[in-house]
Every structure is written in structure tokens, then in C-alpha cells.
Amino acid sequence: MAREHRVLSRLSAGFPLAPNSFLFCDDDEIIGAPFQVMERRHGKVIRRELPEECNARPDINRRIGEMMIDALADLHMIRRDDVGLEDLGHPEGFTQRQLDGWTKRWKDAGAADNTDMERLIAWLYQHRPTLEQSALVHNDYKLDNMLVDNSEPWRAVAILDWDMCTSGEPLADLGYLLNQWAQPDDPPLWIEESTMPTAQSGFPSRTESIERYATQTGYDCDTIHWHYAFAAMRFAVIIQQIYIRYVRGQTQDDRFATFDTRVATYIDKGCRIASL
């Protein structure tokens, strides 16, 4: 929360989709926990299901897809020193630290030996991009972390959940978004796992989205499939962390009983992206 306040209280002056954060208080005695006072934005969140006004409207769906890419591109074009965030994070070595960190989390998550995951991790290390670009990175950018206009859902009102924002490789955000960007010709399990309705008629394809992002930012996107594969690996680790807590009896929620199948889906996805 403190990090989010720091980011938004500065970024909001230079990036219209960042709601302002007016106050952060870490004194537990006031309301019983730390709290934050933020600007209110009015809009709605789109998750797996499209709003009623988008049904059978591929033209609207395309505009929603383009809006997601445009908003991300606009964020990545913000100069950190223009908004007082030049000292946020450590962009040097960002990709290597991310790969090391998520590999360690996988090993710590109690997973049984998994040949496919070992192959995917080895490929990620062998092909880690050497070119490092630097921008403000949201780190959890997807459609349901946005507010869109109530009557014009192709118009963004705000981007939410900035608690993991840092400085690093901008393609990490794009790869993360692509991992949730299903399209009609994807395997059924990929579509089922997606948190976004992009497999519906009209949404741009992943390739079109990459091209639009590259045109708008000028960033080198030659290594985007590495970041896409890494995002799939990262999701596998996150779900494995939840699954192992269930196996160990640390949570009783029976929804987690089949999460091993979801882990396998993301590992397979990462391997396919990497052509393994």
C-alpha cells in the first residue's frame, strides 16, 4: 500500500489513467490497520464476460482490445524523472532477477519433479534477452485491473492495483498481458484459463496487439515471445504455490484440489510458446 501511494501520488500528475493517492497512514491505531485515501473514479470492470452492449458487436470488442494496448503503451512512454519516480526500483538486471526469483519460488513450492517445467526453465535461461529496455512497469496489467467507462467500454477510465509497480523491462508487462489474451484458435484450456474475453469476435489477435504496441512505443519487440513464455511459467508457479498449500492442509478450500491440472496447462503453454 505504501508503494502504491508513492507511485500514484506522483504518477497521477503525468498519466491520466493513474488515480491520485492523497494519503497513506501506517498507524494501526486509527482504524485498526494501515490505510490509503485515493481519488474515486467511476466506471466498471470487465472480466471474462463482456458487458451486454458488447454482445454481437465485434467493432466494440476491437476498440476495447486496442484500448488495452494503447493504455499500456502510454504508460511505458512516461519518463520516470518527469513524474518524480526516477528512483523507483532497479531496472538494471530486472529480467534476470525475475527469472531467478520465479525459478526459486517453483523449487520452494514443493512441486514433484517435472521434466517439462525443467525444460521450460532451461530454455528461459538459455534464451534470456540480453537487450534491456527500461520503463515504468505495472507488473499486473490486464483488463480486470482497469476501469472502463460505463457507457463507452472502449474508453479507459483508470488502471488499478499499482502495488507491484516498478522500473524494468516494458515487454514484461506486454508478455504478462498476452498470457491472458486468448484468441479463438487457441487450445480450449488456454481459453478457459483466460481472465479476459479476448477470444470473442472482433478482438485483435496477439500478433496484431504486439504490432500495435511496437508501433506506438518504438520498443524492440523481437524477444516478446520470451516474455510471453515467461509469463506462462510465472502463472504456473503462482498456481502451484496455492495448490501445495491445499495439499499440506494449510487451506481447506476444495476449489484448489484440481489446481495441479491448471499448473500443467500453463507449463504446457510455456513449452508450446518456446516451441519445445
Task: Cite the ranges covered by each PLM segment.
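ATP-binding pocket architecture of kinase catalytic cores
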Residues: 1-119, 123-136, 150-154, 276
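A short acidic, glycine-rich active-site loop
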Residues: 57-65, 195-202, 257
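All-alpha amphipathic helical-bundle segments outside canonical DNA-binding/catalytic cores
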Residues: 89-90, 220-231
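Catalytic-loop of the protein kinase fold
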Residues: 136-138, 143
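Hydrophobic residue at the +6 position relative to the catalytic HRD Asp in the kinase catalytic loop
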Residues: 146-148
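Activation of the activation-loop gatekeeper triad in protein kinase-fold domains
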Residues: 159-165
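Active-site activation/catalytic loop segments of kinase-like enzymes and analogous catalytic loops
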Residues: 172-217, 231-249
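Regulatory N- and C-terminal appendages and interdomain linkers associated
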Residues: 237, 241-276
